[in-house]
Every structure is written in C-alpha cells, then in structure tokens.
C-alpha cells in the first residue's frame, strides 16, 4: 500500500508507532503499537470516537501498554520494520477505504480492521467493548456523510467543536453574567437575524460599552425561550480566531479550517448563529500572496443567508477596516451601541452585584454601586461606562478579599516595620559608641511594643476571618441551588423545583442569616481589622489610588486643614494676603463640592514684580494639597514664543515627527490629573498659545494631537506674568485698588478679552517691604537649621543678625531673591568652611550674631 495515500493524521500515528517500537526495543511495528499511538494523539479524536462507540478508552490504553511490554525485545536493533500482522491489517484498512469511496485512507478505518482482527490487538480491543456495528455508527456520525477527499480531511472534522465556543451552553450552565437593560439593542439584533438575506447584525460601539454582553444576553434569552419562534433552540457559537490561525503552518491550512467551519454551519441549516468578536480581524486574516483573506471567504455565505453571523467591533476599527471593504460592509446591518447613562449603569451593576459578591466572598452595598457609577463617570474620562464602573466594583471587592485572605494592611505594615527594626538592631549592635548604644535601647523598646501590638491584632484577625469565610461558603451553596432551579424549570421538572425552592433554599437563606449575624456580633467596630463590605468609601479609595484625586469624604482633620489653609500657606508665602485668600477660597469651594464641575478648581493670573512670591505660592499650594511639590506641573512659556511651538504643548498632529510622543502639557495632566499647572512668564508665549487655553479655562478639557480628551477639571491653573511690575513699584505708596486698576489697563492691552474673561481671578502681588523680607529671612534660616540638624548641629541666630541679613538682602526691584544670596555669602559660606576645618562637630551649637559690623560664629559645646 502507498503511504502517501494515508491521511496526515494516520501518517503521524504510524511515525509515533515506530517510535514506540524503538523505545521498547521491539524488532517489528505491531498493531498494538499503532493502536496505542492513535489513542495518545494530542487532539484526542480517536479517544472521542471510541467513547462514542461505547469503548472504555482509558482501560484500553492501559491494556495496550501492558501488552506491548510483553512483546519480544531485541537489544541493539536500530531499524524496525512493519510486522506481518500490521501489514495485513493495513491492507484490510485499504479495502475498507475503497468500499467507502475514500481517496485517502483515514485512521478510523484501521479501527474497523482491528474490530475484525483475530490477533492480540483485536482481542484486547474487544475485551474493552469494541464492536464493529457500534463503531460503524460512530464513524458515520463523525463523517456526516462525507468521504475522505484530502490528506487533511480528518483534522477538519468537528470543526465547530474545535474552533468555536458554545455560548448557549455556557448560558445553560450559568457561566455567563446576567445582562441588564440593552433591550432595544437585543431586539434590533433579533429583528435583523430574522431577515431573509443580509441577516447579519454588527454591533458597533466604544470599548467597554457592552457589545459582547448583548450577544450573551441573546444567548440567555434563547435558553429561557424568550425569543421569537424562529430563533428558539438555536445555538450561538463564538468563533475562536486564535484557534483558527494557531499552528496553520502551510499555505491553505487556515483557509481549509475556516471552510470546514463554514461547511459545518451550512450543514446545521440555520440552527447556528456565529458570533465573531473583533470582526475587523477577519479582514486581512490569512492573507498571503495569491490567497484570499477570511473576510472574502465569508462574503458568499453572508450574501446567500447561509451564515447567520453577529459581528462586534469598535467605531474606529469599523471605519478603518470594514468600511473600506464596501462589499463586506453591505452584508452587515449596523447596530450602534451607545454608552449607557449613569442611571442605566447603576441598574447594570445591581444585576451583576450577586455574581461579584459570590466571586469575592464579600458584600457589595448599594451606596458602593451608586458611587462606582457616579465617580467613574466624573473622574475616569478616558474610558466608558459600564466597563469602568464594573472595574471599580471589582477592584474594591478584590482589595477587601485580599485583606481577608492575606494579612490586613495594618498587620502587614507592622510586620514590615518589625523586619526593618530587626535589621537596624543587628547593624547598631556592632557599634560601640554612646549614641549607638542609646539608639539600640530605643530600638529594643520599639520592637517589644510592636510585637505585642502585632500579637493582639493577629488574634482579632483570625476570629474575624473564620466568621467571614462561613458566610461566603453558604452564599456559594445558594448560588448552586438557584442554578439547579433554573435548569429544572427549563426541563419542566416542577416537583423537584418546588422541593428546592420551598425546602432547600429557605434552609440555606436561614443559615446565611445566622452566619451574617454571627459575623456582625463578632465585630468590634473600634478594633475591627477585616472589612467584609464594599461601601462608597472603598470605591472612592480605588478612584483616589488610580487618579490621585481625593474623592473620599473629608475627614475632620482635612476639614480643619482646609479652614486654616491661609495660615499654612503663610508659613511659606509672606505678605501676599489677598493672593493667598483668593487661592484658598477656590480650593475650599471645590473640596466642599459647590464649585462648577466642568471647570478647573481655579484659574488665576498672578501679576507682580520678580521675587515677590508668585512661583513660591504655587509650590506652597502643591505642597499643601499633595504633601509634595512633585504635583506642580511647571511649564516655562518663554519656550513657546514661535507659532509652531503650540504643538509641543498638545502634541504633534498626525504625519509629523513626534506624533506618538504626546504634548508636554497634555501628557503631564493625563498622568497627574490632580495637580497645580504653573504656566510661568505667560506673556512671553506666542498669542496663538492662548487660543488653546480658552477651552481649558472654560470647559476644563483639552484635545491632544491624537484626538484624546484630557481632563483639566481637577487642576488649579496658575499663570504668572511680569506685566505691570514697573507700575507696581512706581505706585507703591498708592492704595491696592488704584494699583490693581492701573495694572489691569496694561494687562488688557496685551491679552485678548476672551482670554481674560475666562480667568477666575487676576491677582496683583505688591512689592515687599523691609518687614516682609525679615519674615522671609527667618523662613530661609529655618530651612538652613533643618539641614544642619541632619549633621547633629543646632543653629541659633540672634535678632540683630536676622535684621542685618534682611537689610543686606533687601532690594525693592528684585524682591526676596537677593536675600538668598545674602544668606549664602554671610552665613552658609563661613559655616561650611568651619565644618570642614573641624571647628564644629556633632552636638555643637552654631551661634550666629552680628556686632561691630560683621557676623560672628563662636562655638558653644552642649
């Protein structure tokens, strides 16, 4: 017989049989070897066929293995030949193929030959249930009336089972999430599916709006019988594109697989609906020189109505791939899936609530659901509902689940702190000086205190964890019973439904109530370690961590901090009372929730001479709001003096170099949406730059070069300018209102009215006087004292020395900047020299005084 007339799978089985014979030192390849090799093939087709014929495939595999071990062995034989028994069986197989009209000999025909075999292989197979009649029936069912016309024919069988996932089956066993709402879209899809031709809906919408969920909803309705008569008992299959492409090594192999899928669907005569998620991937899939792609292979079947297909893709990809192929586009009917409203999202989340509670073993409260929908809509602007709201619920529940399963955050922090202290203790033990011994004593005390605290917390945690897990187990059992009730209702077994619904279910609900009550009674709110509920506060925490925006309810400490905001800012900014008050009011309005949600927290134009605290106030504000100056986005507008430099702020347009990189301003705000944006020296920028700032100041949004909307609603925008600084110095003796009026006139000549009209406040910084400079000197000296404290040195400076520094560093034209230079020259330089000379050592006091026209530094030892 010719080996090239065997199917590819049969040839592979023969090669595996040869390897088996070599591995067992058998001189001949016997039917036992080939039968075992077929059973061990990775796709499991032979096993499935034998199982259909009522054969115990697992038992047969073990028996064949044992029989091979009993075959005669020859040591050193490098060549194996086809044995006489196998040769005669292969001839019998060929006859079976001719009888059936096959062009290639398939592996299942060898099983028919084995069924009639009088040798060892036939005996073992019959012992495990192999019968010719049952096997023939199984082969006919698998072949579906087809003959074997190509070498790849076997691999194309049962293509639907291999390359699709049955969505209706998943709905039947309760694997799919419930689909709430979307009735109009599902009804429209059903309407299109009932057409005579072009009965193929394509769901188009933004990522995350629920396109796939609509198809899942359709599958659930089919299972529940809530569809028109023509759709009842149909199957919804999801095409596995990755499975179709994976391992298609040779040209034409992918096309053969897809053709097999289409043929199988055609055989089902309209009882199958094929769902292709990300349908744009079909355009160009499998394309090679001289070959047609998957999209073109689908067109004839779609046009004839043989293929009921539902597609899903995003708006961008539909435009980019499907619309370009007009012939493919006309075969689909568009169903637009819009983003649901906040109210609709809340309804969707309530439907999913039970599934997520069950998965995470926690309780999700209704305030958490409302907060997830509202906060995601307001603060996560680059994604779409309901996906982003579901993500918040999922992550908040996962966080609480993680606390239950692993150590709570409080214990984890204690544990890490203990490890840190123990490492430090070992390091300090090696030192012998007095300071190190004192430090060792403190470390020992701290370790003892923390270990006691940790032991107390561990005891509470274990008790709470046991109670939480008890309730979760009962919830899982309730879910299983509900799924069983739904299945029995579909099958019409109402007696069993009644038994479960009125017997088992109330019993479990009673258990759950008891478990929840036990959990609640074990709660000691002040000491409670484990949270078992997801509330609005937990959702707010997730949003805050993701965006850096403080959306949680204000604690009393933060309320007090905001009420005393002016005092905190005045610790760094001296003399500019009006500026500090205006900025503080803007922040309080936004944090209290009464500011316009569609505008930035505040937009200010700071005007004044150099060195009076404009930039310092921005730094102080960033430090106050975020405890870090890193949230200050500072852009020097003198870099944007040319017209074309606007693109550097928002990113280059398509086709230009740097398109992928994004803009300075837009990228910085996308990464830190809650920040202070400082546009320094704004009057030096090109007038066209102000045009892009108009929509930021008015609507709190800006579109970057890639078409993405960047949200500025949680930023404070500050622009500084030196316009009118000469007027401020010349009119120093005039009242603030007169100065502001004069400066305002000059500002109006430089900036456009539509720009000035959108700014919340124009703040005029007045020139600093001698008293202000003295206060600033004390702030600067405190910073120097803090730096010296790191070296265990104490700085003590007398009032005459401060006064002299203030007078030396006072210049009405340059503001406070000369003061820094005065401190550097008069204090820092001499002290640095003395430290290097060894005149000051740790524990010393560095006294600074001024008399007889110069500064003195007389060492004092403590």
Swiss-Prot record:
Annotated positions binding ATP 1: 205-212
Q: Where in the cell is it found?
A: Cytoplasm
Region (Repeat 2), start-end ranges: 82-145
What residue ranges carry the coiled-coil annotation?
A: 390-524
One of the GO biological process terms: cellular response to heat
Annotated GO molecular function terms are: ATP binding; ATP hydrolysis activity
Assigned keywords, A-Z: ATP-binding, Chaperone, Coiled coil, Cytoplasm, Nucleotide-binding, Repeat, Stress response
Q: Name one GO cellular component term.
A: cytoplasm
In what residue span(s) does the Clp R domain sit? 3-145
Which residue intervals make up region (Repeat 1)?
6-71
Q: Where is this region: Linker?
A: 340-548
The cross-references to InterPro entries, in alphabetical order and at most eight, read: AAA+_ATPase, ATPase_AAA_core, Chaperonin_ClpB, Clp_ATPase_C, Clp_N_dom_sf, Clp_R_dom, ClpA/B, ClpA/B_CS1
In terms of Gene3D superfamilies, this protein maps to:
1.10.8.60, Clp, N-terminal domain (1.10.1780.10), P-loop containing nucleotide triphosphate hydrolases (3.40.50.300)
Report residue spans for region: NBD2: 558-767
Subunit info? Homohexamer. The oligomerization is ATP-dependent.
> Family per UniProt?
Belongs to the ClpA/ClpB family.
Query: What does its UniProt record remark on the domains?
Result: The Clp repeat (R) domain probably functions as a substrate-discriminating domain, recruiting aggregated proteins to the ClpB hexamer and/or stabilizing bound proteins. The NBD2 domain is responsible for oligomerization, whereas the NBD1 domain stabilizes the hexamer probably in an ATP-dependent manner. The movement of the coiled-coil domain is essential for ClpB ability to rescue proteins from an aggregated state, probably by pulling apart large aggregated proteins, which are bound between the coiled-coils motifs of adjacent ClpB subunits in the functional hexamer.
* Protein name stated in the entry: Chaperone protein ClpB
Originating organism: Ralstonia nicotianae (strain ATCC BAA-1114 / GMI1000)
Gene (UniProt):
clpB
């Amino acid at each position: 017989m010719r080996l090239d007339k065997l199917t590819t799978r049969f040839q592979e089985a023969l090669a595996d049989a040869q390897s088996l014979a070599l591995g067992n030192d058998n001189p001949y390849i016997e039917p036992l070897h080939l039968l075992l090799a077929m059973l061990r093939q990775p796709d499991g087709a032979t096993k499935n066929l034998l199982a259909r014929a009522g054969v115990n495939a697992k038992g047969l595999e073990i028996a064949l293995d044992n029989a091979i071990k009993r075959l005669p062995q020859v040591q050193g034989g490098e060549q194996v030949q086809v044995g006489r028994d196998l040769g005669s069986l292969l001839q019998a197989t060929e006859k079976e193929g001719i009888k059936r009209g096959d062009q290639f000999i398939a592996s299942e025909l060898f099983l028919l030959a084995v069924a009639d075999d009088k040798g060892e292989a036939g005996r073992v197979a019959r012992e495990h249930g192999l019968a010719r009649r049952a096997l023939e029936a199984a082969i006919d069912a698998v072949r579906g009336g087809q003959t074997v016309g190509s070498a790849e024919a076997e691999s194309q069988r049962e293509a639907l089972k291999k390359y699709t996932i049955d969505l209706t089956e998943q709905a039947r066993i309760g694997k799919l999430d419930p689909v709430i709402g979307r009735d109009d879209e599902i009804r429209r899809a059903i309407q299109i599916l009932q057409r005579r031709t072009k009965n193929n809906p394509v769901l188009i919408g933004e990522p995350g709006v629920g396109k796939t969920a609509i198809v899942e909803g359709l599958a659930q309705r089919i299972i529940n019988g809530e569809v028109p008569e023509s759709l009842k008992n149909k199957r919804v299959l999801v095409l596995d594109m990755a499975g179709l492409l994976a391992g298609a090594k040779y040209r034409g192999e992918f096309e053969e697989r897809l053709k097999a899928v289409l043929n199988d669907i055609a055989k089902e005569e309209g009882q199958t609906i094929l769902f292709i998620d990300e349908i744009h991937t079909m355009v160009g899939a499998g394309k090679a020189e001289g070959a047609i792609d998957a999209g073109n292979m689908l067109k004839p079947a779609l046009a004839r109505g043989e293929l009921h297909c539902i597609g899903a893709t995003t708006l961008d990809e539909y435009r980019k791939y499907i619309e370009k192929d007009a012939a493919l586009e006309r075969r689909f009917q568009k169903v637009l899936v819009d983003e649901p409203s906040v109210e609709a999202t809340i309804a969707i989340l309530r439907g999913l609530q039970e599934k997520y509670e069950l998965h995470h073993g926690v309780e999700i409260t209704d305030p958490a659901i409302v907060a997830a929908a509202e906060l995601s809509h307001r603060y996560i602007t680059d994604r779409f509902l309901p996906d982003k709201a579901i993500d918040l619920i999922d992550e908040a529940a996962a966080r609480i689940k993680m606390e239950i399963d692993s150590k709570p955050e409080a214990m984890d922090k204690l544990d890490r702190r203990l490890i840190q202290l123990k490492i430090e203790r070992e390091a300090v033990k090696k030192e012998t000086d007095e300071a190190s011994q004192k430090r060792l004593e403190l470390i020992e005390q701290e370790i003892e205190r923390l270990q006691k605290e940790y032991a107390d917390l561990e005891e509470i945690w274990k008790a709470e964890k046991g109670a939480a897990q008890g309730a979760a187990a009962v919830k899982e059992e309730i879910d299983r019973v509900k799924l069983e009730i739904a299945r029995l209702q579909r099958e019409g077994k109402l007696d069993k439904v009644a038994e479960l619904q009125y017997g088992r279910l109330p019993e479990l609900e009673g258990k759950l109530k008891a478990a929840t009550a036990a959990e609640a009674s074990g709660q000691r709110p002040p000491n409670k370690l484990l949270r078992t509920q997801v509330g609005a506060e937990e959702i707010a925490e997730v949003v805050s961590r993701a965006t850096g925006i403080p959306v949680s309810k204000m604690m009393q400490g933060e309320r007090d901090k905001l009420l005393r905001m002016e005092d905190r800012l005045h610790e760094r900014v001296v003399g500019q009372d009006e500026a500090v008050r205006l900025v503080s009011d803007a922040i309080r309005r936004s944090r209290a929730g009464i500011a316009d949600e569609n505008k930035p927290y505040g937009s200010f134009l700071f005007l004044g001479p150099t060195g009076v605290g404009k930039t310092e106030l921005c730094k102080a504000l960033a430090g106050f709001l975020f405890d870090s100056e890193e949230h200050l986005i500072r852009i020097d507008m003198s870099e944007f003096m040319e017209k074309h430099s606007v693109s550097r702020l928002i990113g280059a347009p398509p086709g230009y170099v740097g398109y992928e990189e994004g803009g300075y301003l837009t990228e910085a705000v996308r990464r830190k949406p809650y920040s202070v944006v400082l546009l320094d020296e704004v009057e030096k920028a090109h007038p066209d730059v102000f045009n892009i700032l108009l929509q930021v100041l008015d609507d709190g949004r800006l579109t970057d070069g890639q078409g993405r909307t960047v949200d500025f609603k949680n930023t404070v925008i500050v622009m500084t300018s030196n316009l009118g600084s000469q007027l401020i110095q010349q009119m120093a003796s005039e009242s603030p209102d007169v100065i502001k009026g004069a400066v305002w006139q000059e500002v109006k000549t430089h900036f456009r009215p539509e720009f000035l009209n959108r700014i919340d406040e124009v703040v005029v910084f007045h020139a600093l006087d001698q008293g202000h400079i003295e206060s600033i000197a004390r702030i600067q000296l405190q910073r120097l004292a803090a730096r010296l404290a790191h070296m265990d040195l104490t700085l003590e400076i007398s009032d005459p020395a401060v006064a002299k520094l203030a007078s030396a560093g006072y210049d009405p034209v340059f503001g406070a900047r000369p003061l820094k230079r005065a401190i550097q020259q008069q204090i820092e330089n001499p002290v640095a020299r003395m430290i290097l000379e060894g005149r000051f050592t740790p524990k010393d006091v560095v006294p600074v005084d001024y008399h007889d026209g110069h500064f003195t530094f007389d060492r004092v030892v403590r």
